[in-house]
């Protein structure tokens, strides 16, 4: 290893005479348009490579033959009818008998609708104490009616 450091001195440009430049490329002269000549030379030298171009054409053909995802038809599964299950449906679609989620029961459905609907002002709110497992309610803690202040004083207020 040498311990000398490399210097970064500028190197003088290589001086070539006009004779040497003329001998290097007889087709080119300073007055010629190099871009046109370059395009002509490239057109002559273009030869299709067998390996890469053949694979590219095969890929284009295979893309055309393959159906795209948006073109593939959806698999049709018949609508579920409760109580009507055949062995054919079970084998083909792996369908198990189940209750649809939308219709859980008429009693539960009505209570949900009543809670979502705004109640009328003349209807008192029913207070249900929270359910605690293992705890029995005393008589005075049973479900009761809570009247709002407006409802109690409604007759006295004149609007």
From Swiss-Prot:
Changing residue 72 to A: Does not potentiate the phosphorylation of the CREB transcription factor. Residues 62-73, 111-124 have a biased composition (Basic and acidic residues). Residues 1-79, 98-127 are annotated as: Disordered. InterPro entries: PPP1R17. One of its GO terms (biological process) is regulation of phosphatase activity. GO terms for cellular component: cytosol. Expressed in Purkinje cells of the cerebellum, hippocampus, pons, medulla and eye. Substrate for cGMP-dependent protein kinase. Phosphorylation of Thr-72 and Thr-123 is required for its phosphatase activity. Phosphorylated by PRKG1 isoform alpha. The modification Phosphothreonine is found at residues 72, 123. Keywords: Phosphoprotein, Protein phosphatase inhibitor. One of its GO terms (molecular function) is protein serine/threonine phosphatase inhibitor activity. Inhibits phosphatase activities of protein phosphatase 1 (PP1) and protein phosphatase 2A (PP2A) complexes. PANTHER family: PROTEIN PHOSPHATASE 1 REGULATORY SUBUNIT 17 (PTHR15387:SF0). This is Protein phosphatase 1 regulatory subunit 17. The lineage of its organism: Eukaryota, Metazoa, Chordata, Craniata, Vertebrata. The gene is Ppp1r17.
């Amino acid at each position: 290893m040498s311990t000398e450091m490399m210097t970064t001195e500028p190197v003088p440009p290589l001086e070539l005479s006009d004779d040497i430049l003329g001998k290097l490329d007889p087709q080119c002269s300073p007055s010629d348009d190099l871009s046109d000549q370059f395009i002509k030379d490239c057109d002559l030298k273009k030869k299709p490579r067998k390996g890469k171009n053949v694979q590219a054409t095969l890929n284009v053909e295979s893309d055309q033959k393959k159906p795209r995802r948006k073109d593939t038809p959806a698999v049709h599964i018949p609508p579920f009818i409760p109580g009507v299950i055949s062995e054919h449906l079970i084998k083909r679609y792996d369908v198990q008998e189940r209750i649809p989620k939308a219709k859980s029961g008429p009693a539960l459905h009505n209570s949900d609708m009543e809670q979502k609907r705004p109640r009328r002002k003349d209807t008192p709110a029913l207070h249900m104490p929270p359910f605690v497992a293992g705890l029995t309610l005393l008589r005075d803690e049973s479900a009761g009616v809570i009247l709002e202040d407006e409802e109690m004083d409604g007759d006295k207020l004149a609007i």
